[in-house]
Amino acid sequence: EGFEEEIKNNLNKYGEYLEDSILSVHMIKIEDKYYCMDFSCEEFEKIVNLLGSVESVYNLYYETLIKAINSDLGKYKPKRIGHLNLVRKYNKKFQYDYSNNKKLKELVKLISDRGYELDYNIAGLFKKDCGETYISGYLEELIKQYNIKLVLGSDSHSAKYIDKYEELNEHI
């Protein structure tokens, strides 16, 4: 949120050279300041305190994803959404039952209506405060209801996670 023109310009400049791209949200805007919601457990706690509840963090994350999907990023805009439940990265410490979250239902319906596909990745399995894939539980059930295409991914930011697909078999 707030960097749409810069993103669109970069996509217009480099989009023709990209085989694949993913639209994802890591930063959320509170008032006029940006916070990286998946940087650290301490940063996530700071965001919870600023917004007043874990539920409010989830809602703002989903609202930001809705804005990203609705934004005009040009003809090279990614058609896949990354780690849709990244907000759960610290769910072991910040528990929240999101099964009745209206914003999440609105988001999944929008993804379906717009024909997006979703990144189903295993990175969360290896995060000590997460322990689940970045599409699991209630969200996975909701996605199945809407018959949204999933694309397997590792979200590997280092070589040690590239070969972790055996773990994924347990979750499919």
What do these predicted ranges mean?
Residues 1-113:
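Extended substrate/RNA-proximal surfaces in nucleic-acid metabolism proteins
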Residues 94-172:
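Charged catalytic cores and adjacent phosphate/nucleic-acid-binding surfaces used
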